[in-house]
């Protein structure tokens, strides 16, 4: 499973908020911010903190990107 946080970064630009400001507003660790920068999975708690700080829904900050294997599996089911 792959995720992308591009929506989050675009939202920060729109809100004129830096990643450091987001980290401070949410209390998430620098290591967690690194995971977000690398499009790695983080906990639902972290995502909820971000949503709360930005007053948005989870779909506004994250996008699910199916892997090739997942796409193939879905095609087999259909």
Q: Where do the PLM segments sit?
A:
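A short, Lys/Arg-rich alpha-helix, primarily the initiator
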Residues: 1-18
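Short, charged recognition helix plus adjacent turn
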Residues: 2, 62-78
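Residues within the helices of the helix-turn-helix
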Residues: 9, 20, 48, 59
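The alpha-helix within a helix-turn-helix
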Residues: 12, 23, 37, 51
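Short alpha-helical DNA-recognition segment
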Residues: 16-34
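Short, basic-rich loop-to-helix N-cap that marks the start of a DNA-contacting helix
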Residues: 40-52
């Amino acid at each position: 499973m792959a995720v992308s946080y591009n929506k989050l970064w675009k939202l920060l630009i729109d809100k004129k908020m830096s990643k450091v400001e987001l980290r401070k507003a949410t209390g998430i660790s620098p290591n967690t911010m690194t995971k977000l920068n690398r499009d790695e999975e983080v906990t639902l708690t972290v995502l909820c903190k971000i949503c709360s700080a930005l007053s948005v829904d989870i779909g506004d900050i994250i996008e699910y990107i199916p892997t090739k294997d997942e796409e193939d599996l879905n095609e087999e089911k259909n």
